[in-house]
Amino acid sequence: IASAPDFTEDLMWAKFDEVTKNTLLKDGIYYEPTEYDEQPYTITLPLIEDGRTHLVLRDKLGINVPIRLLHGMSDADVPYEVSLRLAEHVISDDVEVILIKDGDHRLSKSKDLMILTAQIEKLLCPNLKSD
């Protein structure tokens, strides 16, 4: 759901301005305002550095199982193209990317949850007929 592999490098570090990067390098910590909470997110230099040791979208991923990626096209935090990139990097042929046009990052609307539930049911019970 709204997959964000490599987010510390591609969605944080690469998009931080020089002031933010310098704050992290100097102080080891940066507070990122968020619309989801009154308190900002705490981003630390160790988080960024650790993320660099776990990058997965630089090579093929040896994952060969059924995969369903759900992503909102109105996600302001993680572009839906990240899910498309992830789908391209796994070796599995059984990959579906489900884009929800009005879906946001949380995909928490009733309609979104119904889509999620249906995908889980299809994966767990592939022989059941759906409506």
Residue ranges of each PLM-predicted region?
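Hydrolase active-site cap/lid region
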Residues: 1-43
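Cofactor-binding loop segments of dinucleotide-utilizing enzymes, especially the Rossmann-like FAD-
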Residues: 3, 72-74, 102
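Short beta-strand/loop motif that positions the catalytic acidic residue
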Residues: 62-63, 69-71, 75
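Active-site nucleophile elbow and catalytic-triad environment of alpha/beta-hydrolase enzymes
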Residues: 40-60, 65
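Acidic catalytic loop of the alpha/beta-hydrolase fold
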Residues: 74-78, 105-106
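Catalytic active-site module of serine/aspartate enzymes centered on a nucleophile-bearing elbow/loop
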Residues: 103-131
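Catalytic histidine neighborhood in serine/cysteine hydrolases
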Residues: 90-106
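Short alpha-helix in the alpha/beta-hydrolase fold that links the catalytic acid
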Residues: 65, 79-88
